[in-house]
UniProtKB/Swiss-Prot annotation:
Recorded coiled-coil stretches: none
Pfam families: ASL_C2 (PF14698), Lyase_1 (PF00206)
Cellular-component GO terms for this entry: cytosol
Lineage: Bacteria, Pseudomonadati, Pseudomonadota, Gammaproteobacteria, Enterobacterales
Species, as recorded: Citrobacter koseri (strain ATCC BAA-895 / CDC 4225-83 / SGSC4696)
Protein name: Argininosuccinate lyase
PROSITE patterns, alphabetized: FUMARATE_LYASES
Molecular function terms from GO: argininosuccinate lyase activity
Pathway of action: Amino-acid biosynthesis; L-arginine biosynthesis; L-arginine from L-ornithine and carbamoyl phosphate: step 3/3
HAMAP family recorded: Arg_succ_lyase (MF_00006)
InterPro entries: Arg_succ_lyase_C (IPR029419), Argininosuccinate_lyase (IPR009049), Fumarase/histidase_N (IPR024083), Fumarate_lyase_CS (IPR020557), Fumarate_lyase_fam (IPR000362), Fumarate_lyase_N (IPR022761), L-Aspartase-like (IPR008948)
Length: 457
């Protein structure tokens, strides 16, 4: 059933109809459309368009339809309706007859779809927040179990300074906490209802829009009808949040892909999140992580597409805005799936501590400690930096780590070096000295774990 047509003397070309129709993707707004329609029916009672009995009939029919949709949402796609609004109205008329045609009084699909989409976004943000916190908890648990797993930290993919696997996990907890904060901020801006703004100029009926917003679970009603039906900031904001969140997950995936290589060998992934090769029987591929990394580009593309769609649109509603949903649905679905998959990866991960320790002892990751030692002996840092660089060259020439050089060898580069240097060069000393807030010392890592656990409790 079309919601328009009186103005037209010819039927739409079937090719145009297929091009124009949006039911194949906006069917996902069915529950929100029905909930919004129930609230609108109540508002129409307050202005005398519907009687209380009529409203009750409509609400009962809409509630029945809501249950049918929850049981079998795919039934919607069997229809040739233009969009979800047409489908809901058609089904309502099937149930209550002519009374169903009164429901759209004073309402436009412009404020209707804006309301539906905001309701859907609120529901989806709640799911994303839950998945985000579940992943944070998984990272904190993994950190707690690996506080003593020493491994190399990297800059430029070169071994830099020793860290722990726990400290690495907690870095991603911080990123996910920022993602959580962004979603919570977005939820605040989402919490205003556009229903009752009509096509663009507001409704002609003196409906209490604040009361209507409350019925729908919004904190308040929007203040400008023209903006309300044109606004898709919430779509851009959530796509931006998803893009940033997926960048974090992509980096998480890339780190673990590297840690899982034969060359690094720091972790082993569970069989549950890996796959094999059709040709090479020895292969165990990190497909879950590679897909997380790959899907990041898909989400970034949705943000870029939506920015380009909106940038040249005049106020108020334009059909271009129908393009807001597919990218948003796909991006948030993808982000949600990747959050769940990242948690599953952690669930079965094995940290190979001996190999991590071995790698941390290689690559002269304790060179900074030697420089700090020289500074403590009164050598200016820039001079100490140069001395240690020369010392590393000598250690490489001899094929030894710094701590295996003889005292005589070390004193060739600085006479202030004494026997007390050797304890300083141990991995444990490297960790213990990083005791300022946010550092990798065991005490700081333990405090960070306790803080994260309390925040997530």
């Amino acid at each position: 059933m079309a919601l328009w047509g009186g103005r037209f003397t010819q039927a739409a070309d079937q090719r145009f109809k297929q091009f124009n129709d949006s039911l194949r993707f906006d069917y996902r707004l069915a529950e929100q459309d029905i909930v919004g329609s129930v609230a609108w029916s109540k508002a129409l009672v307050t202005v005398g368009v519907l009687t209380a009995d009529e409203q009750l009939q409509l609400e009962e029919a809409l509630s029945a339809l809501l249950e049918e949709v929850r049981v079998n949402p795919q039934q919607i796609l069997e229809s040739d309706a233009e969009d979800i609004h047409s489908w809901v109205e058609g089904k309502l008329i099937d149930k209550v007859g002519q009374l169903g045609k009164k429901l759209h009084t004073g309402r436009s699909r412009n404020d209707q779809v804006a309301t539906d989409l905001k309701l859907w976004c609120k529901d989806t943000v709640t799911e994303l927040l839950s998945a985000n916190r579940q992943l944070q908890s998984a990272l904190v648990e993994t950190a707690q179990n690996n506080q003593d797993a020493v491994m190399p930290g990297y800059t430029h993919l070169q071994r830099a300074q020793p860290v722990t696997f726990a400290h690495w996990c907690l870095a991603y907890v911080e990123m996910l906490a920022r993602d959580e904060s962004r979603l919570q901020d977005a939820l605040k801006r989402l919490d205003v209802s556009p229903l009752g703004c009509g096509a663009l100029a507001g409704t002609a009926y003196e409906i209490d829009r604040e009361q209507l917003a409350g019925w729908l679970g919004f904190a308040s009603a929007t203040r400008n009808s023209l903006d309300s039906v044109s606004d898709r900031d919430h779509v851009l904001e959530l796509l931006s949040d998803a893009s940033i969140g997926m960048v974090h997950l992509s980096r998480f995936a890339e780190d673990l892909i590297f840690f899982n290589t034969g060359e690094a060998g720091f972790v082993e992934l569970s069989d549950r999140v890996t796959s094999g090769s059709s040709l090479m029987p020895q292969k165990k591929n990190p497909d879950a992580l590679e897909l997380i990394r790959g899907k990041c580009g898909r989400v970034q593309g949705a943000l870029t597409a939506m920015m380009m769609t909106l940038k040249g649109l005049p106020l108020a509603y334009n059909k271009d805005m129908q393009e807001d949903k597919e990218g948003l649905f796909d991006a948030l679905d993808t982000w949600l799936d990747c959050l769940h998959m990242a948690a599953l990866v952690l669930d079965g991960i094995q940290v190979k501590r001996p190999r991590c320790q071995e790698a941390a002892q290689q690559g002269y990751a304790n060179a900074t400690e030697l420089a700090d030692y020289l500074v403590a002996k009164g050598v200016p840092f820039r001079e100490a930096h140069h001395i240690v660089g020369e010392t590393v060259v000598e250690a490489i020439r001899q094929g030894k780590p710094l701590e295996d050089l003889s005292l005589a060898d070390l004193q060739k580069f600085s006479a202030v070096i004494g026997d007390d240097v050797y304890p300083i060069l141990s991995l444990q000393s490297c960790l213990d000295k990083r005791a300022a807030k946010g550092g990798v010392s065991p005490q700081q890592v333990a405090q960070a774990i306790d803080y994260a656990k309390a925040r997530l409790a």
